[in-house]
């Protein structure tokens, strides 16, 4: 009897266990079939997720370590709309904290009901984000991000450029060196609690790659000097814009690259497309008379002319292939130095017609015109040199005094560095730590020194470009005034005013190119508009760099002449 009872109890226990197992299995099947979405949501809330490990974008500095672009930590607010679906009554409170209309926020949530990640506001300060998170609204979270800030604002805006909302370079140096600056974000695996908050970090799935800082060759002190001088000139002469490039001819490093007008990259409301491009590199133009020293160097190199060779320029005009060329002032006979002092189109044309187009074209190419500068800057326009299978006389003459070719302002600074550097062409660079290994002889050293001496006379002769002088220093340079093209011809009363020069002329340490676009008041000649701007920038830069003067005995006279004229 006792044996039967034991069997009965055993069968009962087994039966109950089987029934319980069937009940549990049935419930699981039911939940899988009928409550799959509910379980998915709950599993998601108690899930393992992958989150980015953001890398701080590299800093851009000037040559002395002054910050030009830095990233500051900010917070962005995001939500899981599926979590918030049951808490839409909280939208008015959330909208108030985000300073957004409640209706707009509600519409955003309802338009993305199935998303698990939706940005609500980006780039908030940590204090602003903490105020939002203090509301304790289910499904609302914050994430650490970085916002770009530009301490030098308008001074370097076109050079530095800017990033988009995701921190990727969009313009200027930010775009050109984006790979260096951005690094690579990592990825980490994290555990999320039922409220969707981070519980702990489990492991790193992808190690972040650190960003690199970029140290530019720019000197912020000199950039400020150039920018303020351009601002003064553009406002005084009612010009459309102004650009300047200051370089060290020995190293090729660009010390200032300025444009006016500019914009504030920290305030997107101030953005105007016309002011955002770096005009020193993107805008090309016919340079006019600042090309004459290169044509003259070809003439000296031909052996047919020297500094004292004479050419008749009377009666102040000449006709070539049916085209009439004029000089601004009537002269009878000029030396080659006199051709540069008086900026005679007739004299330069007659010289060019004697030596032919080939030596001039080759010389222009050797000093870098028509070729990219390879600065790593997006949007650079290298301009062009003319090419003809058969050169007409007017084509040769026009090229000799700066028409039928196109250059940018930075190219002018690089080309004039050849005169400053005894014929050596050192490619320009925007980086502080960028040793040059492509230096080449672009002009005979003797010819370069002779042209430099002629350009010094252009500035120091009483009939020369006196407004380009700098107290305490010998200056060598050339002005230019170029008519602006319009359709198939040239616009009336629309000019670009230029001056390119170097100092101290005895051993040039700085080369500066200045271009003022479309002056409308007082005058438009390069010697009137751009020469004094050159003087202001060069004088301030020489002082800032403590470059010793080489013309002390003439300082008071120069200062007096500049003050009165």
Swiss-Prot record:
Where, subcellularly, is it found? Cell inner membrane
Q: Where is the active site?
A: 289
Q: List, alphabetically, the InterPro entries matched.
A: Bact_Transpept/Beta-Lactamase, Beta-lactam/transpept-like, FtsI_transpept, PBP_dimer, PBP_dimer_sf, PCN-bd_Tpept
Matching entries from SUPFAM superfamilies are given as: beta-lactamase/transpeptidase-like, Penicillin binding protein dimerisation domain
Q: What one GO molecular function would you report for this record?
A: serine-type D-Ala-D-Ala carboxypeptidase activity
**What catalytic activity does the UniProt entry give for this protein?**
Preferential cleavage: (Ac)2-L-Lys-D-Ala-|-D-Ala. Also transpeptidation of peptidyl-alanyl moieties that are N-acyl substituents of D-alanine
What Gene Ontology biological process does one annotation of this record name?
cell wall organization
Q: What happens when the gene is disrupted?
A: Inactivation causes no changes in the cell morphology or growth rate of exponentially growing cells.
TM helices/strands, residue ranges: 10-30
A Pfam family that the UniProt record links to this protein? Transpeptidase
- Family label: Belongs to the transpeptidase family. FtsI subfamily.
Q: What is this protein called?
A: Probable peptidoglycan D,D-transpeptidase PbpC
Q: What is the taxonomic lineage of the source species?
A: Bacteria, Pseudomonadati, Pseudomonadota, Gammaproteobacteria, Pseudomonadales
What is the name of the gene encoding this protein?
Answer: pbpC
């Amino acid at each position: 009897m006792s044996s039967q009872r034991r069997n009965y109890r055993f069968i009962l226990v087994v039966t109950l266990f089987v029934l319980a197992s069937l009940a549990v299995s049935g419930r699981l099947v039911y939940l899988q079939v009928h409550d799959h979405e509910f379980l998915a949501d709950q599993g998601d809330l108690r899930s393992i997720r992958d989150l980015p490990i953001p890398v701080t974008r590299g800093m851009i500095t000037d040559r002395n370590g002054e910050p030009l672009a830095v990233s500051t930590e900010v917070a962005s607010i995001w939500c899981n709309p599926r979590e918030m679906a049951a808490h839409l009554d909280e939208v008015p409170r959330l909208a108030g904290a985000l300073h957004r209309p409640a209706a707009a926020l509600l519409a955003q949530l309802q338009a993305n009901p199935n998303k698990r990640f939706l940005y609500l506001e980006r780039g908030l300060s940590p204090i602003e984000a903490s105020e939002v998170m203090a509301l304790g609204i289910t499904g609302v979270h914050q994430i650490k991000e970085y916002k770009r800030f530009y301490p030098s604002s308008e001074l370097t805006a076109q050079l530095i450029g800017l990033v988009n909302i995701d921190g990727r370079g969009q313009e200027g140096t930010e775009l050109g060196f984006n790979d260096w600056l951005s690094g690579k974000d990592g990825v980490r695996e994290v555990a999320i609690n039922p409220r969707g908050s981070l519980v702990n970090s489990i492991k790193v799935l992808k190690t972040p790659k650190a960003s690199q800082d970029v140290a530019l060759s720019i000197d912020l002190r000199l950039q400020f000097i150039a920018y303020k001088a351009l601002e003064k000139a553009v406002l005084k002469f009612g010009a459309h814009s102004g650009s300047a490039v200051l370089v060290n001819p020995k190293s090729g490093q660009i010390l200032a690259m300025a444009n006016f007008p500019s914009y504030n990259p920290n305030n997107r409301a101030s953005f105007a497309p016309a002011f955002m491009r770096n005009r020193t590199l993107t805008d090309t133009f016919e340079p006019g008379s600042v090309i004459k020293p290169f044509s003259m160097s070809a003439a000296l190199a031909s052996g047919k002319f020297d500094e004292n060779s004479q050419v008749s320029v009377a009666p102040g005009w000449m006709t070539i292939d049916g085209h009439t060329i004029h000089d601004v002032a009537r002269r009878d006979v000029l030396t080659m130095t006199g051709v540069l002092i008086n900026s005679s189109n007739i004299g330069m044309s007659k010289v060019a017609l004697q030596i032919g187009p080939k030596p001039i074209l080759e010389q222009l190419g050797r000093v870098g015109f028509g070729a990219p500068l390879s600065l790593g800057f997006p949007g650079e326009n290298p301009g062009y040199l003319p090419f003809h299978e058969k050169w007409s006389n007017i084509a040769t003459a026009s090229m000799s005094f700066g028409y039928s070719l196109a250059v940018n302002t930075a190219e002018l600074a690089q080309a004039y560095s050849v005169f400053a550097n005894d014929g050596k062409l050192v490619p320009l660079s925007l980086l502080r730590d960028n040793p040059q290994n492509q230096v080449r002889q672009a002009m005979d050293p003797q010819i370069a020194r002779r042209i430099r001496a002629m350009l010094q006379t252009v500035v120091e002769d009483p009939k020369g470009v006196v407004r380009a002088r700098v107290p305490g220093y010998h200056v060598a340079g050339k002005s230019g005034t170029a008519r602006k093209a319009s359709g198939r011809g040239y616009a009336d009363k629309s000019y670009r005013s230029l001056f390119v020069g170097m100092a101290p002329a005895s051993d040039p340490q700085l080369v500066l190119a200045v271009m003022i676009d479309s002056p409308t008041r007082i005058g438009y000649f390069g010697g009137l508009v751009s020469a004094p701007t050159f003087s202001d920038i060069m004088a301030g830069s020489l002082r800032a760099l403590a470059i010793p003067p080489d013309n002390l005995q003439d300082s008071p006279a120069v200062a007096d002449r500049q003050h009165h004229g």
